């Protein structure tokens, strides 16, 4: 019985240490989440401004584009970032974390992405994958799926400079017709307890509404020309959309980490409670047995 008591005490002590670690990790993730939510809010302000400017600049092109037959879009009359072309190959940017301890965050993304790819494509020649996050890159490679480009080791609050190369690579691959459309697959941050899997079309750019341009009484003086400005601004806008998805995904990752560590801490506390009850019962049994032995010994001496 004594050995059993010592074993239970050791398990209680080790579980308490684990609980302290998971509690600390929960607090760290909560701090990261707060910071990421602030960064996401700031980015939304920037995104709204650049979207407004781009909408004004391409309003005329978009109006014509929507009235033009699909077959005429390959003649070069429209900017490559706007014109839809026949889809021979699809590009996917899949955003996951580099590490674990984030609950079902990664499994949700990868499971639904694989399901979508298998449903929409008959062979791996019909799509190209770009992986942001080591978990996703390793997942695809382990299944014999080629990863065209990957990025690992993002910081907790990624700057655009950190992701510039992979974002620019993705837009350049589209412009060079390596693939004909580009989607980003990631978990969207809803709140601290909830995230939602999203597949957002980034290229060609389709989220601009010409009617929004007429809602602002603004005029732009364009130098050297609207076309030259669009050549610079449209890729930048597309890159900002991808960067926004990365920030959103990182925020969801921190929320998932915080939730996972809270669950781990709560589970540890439940285990400690159960072990404490077991310890008290074992201790009570040991005391009862000792009393019984003493009484029996005293009776034998009479």
UniProtKB/Swiss-Prot annotation:
Membrane as UniProt keyword: yes
Which terms under GO biological process does the entry name?
Answer: proton motive force-driven plasma membrane ATP synthesis
* InterPro entries (alphabetical): ATP_synth_F1_ATPase_gsu (IPR035968), ATP_synth_F1_gsu (IPR000131), ATP_synth_F1_gsu_CS (IPR023632)
- How would you describe this protein's topology in the membrane? Peripheral membrane protein
Where would you say this protein principally sits, based on its record?
membrane
| One Gene Ontology term of the molecular function aspect | ATP binding
Sorted alphabetically, the keyword list is: ATP synthesis, Cell membrane, CF(1), Hydrogen ion transport, Ion transport, Membrane, Transport
| Gene Ontology cellular component terms for the protein in this record | plasma membrane; proton-transporting ATP synthase complex
Q: Which compartment or compartments is the protein found in?
A: Cell membrane
A matching Pfam family: ATP-synt
- On the tree of life, the source organism's domain of life is Bacteria
> What biological function has been recorded for the protein in this entry?
Produces ATP from ADP in the presence of a proton gradient across the membrane. The gamma chain is believed to be important in regulating ATPase activity and the flow of protons through the CF(0) complex.
Q: Which PANTHER family match?
A: ATP SYNTHASE GAMMA CHAIN, ATP SYNTHASE SUBUNIT GAMMA, MITOCHONDRIAL
Q: Which NCBIfam families match?
A: ATPsyn_F1gamma, PRK05621.2-1
Q: Which family does it belong to?
A: Belongs to the ATPase gamma chain family.
Fill in the subunit field for this protein.
F-type ATPases have 2 components, CF(1) - the catalytic core - and CF(0) - the membrane proton channel. CF(1) has five subunits: alpha(3), beta(3), gamma(1), delta(1), epsilon(1). CF(0) has three main subunits: a, b and c.
What protein name does the entry list? ATP synthase gamma chain
The gene coding this protein: atpG
